[in-house]
């Protein structure tokens, strides 16, 4: 058993496969995800886990060099993202999901609580 950090094996594997500039997303429970994109579904019930809980667990595990959020994203979601942010329409964000390596589905019920992250490098 792992001693610390992420425990979900699918999530650990997906993160380990990321390369520089690969994109991935953290999404609310209602975001339509393209069929061909891997979904790592962490949602248990509405509101659990929250976007913030998932993002806080991910931050020590990944290197991020940029992010994309939709125009309607709440300010609290923007404040959680510790990198340069590009703001696009919600439709453009949904279109960009098609290029993501995977999407992490949370139990978040806040509208537009969706962020696409661009992987950086640790060196």
UniProtKB/Swiss-Prot annotation:
Pathway: Carbohydrate metabolism; D-ribose degradation; D-ribose 5-phosphate from beta-D-ribopyranose: step 1/2. The active site is at residue 20. Substrate binds at residues 28, 90, 112-114. GO terms for cellular component: cytosol. One of its GO terms (biological process) is D-ribose catabolic process. Pfam families: RbsD_FucU. InterPro entries: D-ribose_pyranase, RbsD-like_sf, RbsD_FucU. GO terms for molecular function: D-ribose pyranase activity; intramolecular lyase activity; monosaccharide binding. Gene3D superfamilies: RbsD-like domain (3.40.1650.10). Keywords: Carbohydrate metabolism, Cytoplasm, Isomerase. Transmembrane segments: none annotated. It comes from the Bacteria. It catalyses: beta-D-ribopyranose = beta-D-ribofuranose. Its EC number is 5.4.99.62. Its main location: cytoplasm. It is found in: Cytoplasm. Catalyzes the interconversion of beta-pyran and beta-furan forms of D-ribose. PANTHER family: D-RIBOSE PYRANASE (PTHR37831:SF1). Belongs to the RbsD / FucU family. RbsD subfamily. Homodecamer. This is D-ribose pyranase. It comes from Corynebacterium glutamicum (strain ATCC 13032 / DSM 20300 / JCM 1318 / BCRC 11384 / CCUG 27702 / LMG 3730 / NBRC 12168 / NCIMB 10025 / NRRL B-2784 / 534).
């Amino acid at each position: 058993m792992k001693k610390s950090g992420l425990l979900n094996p699918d999530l650990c594997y997906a993160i380990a496969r990321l390369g520089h500039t690969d994109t991935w997303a953290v999404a609310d429970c209602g975001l339509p995800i393209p069929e061909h994109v891997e979904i790592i579904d962490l949602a248990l019930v509405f509101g659990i886990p929250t976007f913030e809980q998932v993002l806080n667990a991910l931050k020590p595990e990944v290197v991020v060099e940029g992010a994309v959020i939709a125009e309607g994203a709440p300010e609290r979601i923007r404040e959680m993202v510790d990198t340069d942010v590009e703001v696009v329409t919600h439709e453009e964000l949904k279109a960009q999901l098609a290029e993501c390596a995977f999407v992490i589905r949370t139990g978040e019920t806040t509208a537009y609580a969706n962020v696409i992250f661009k992987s950086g490098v640790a060196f």
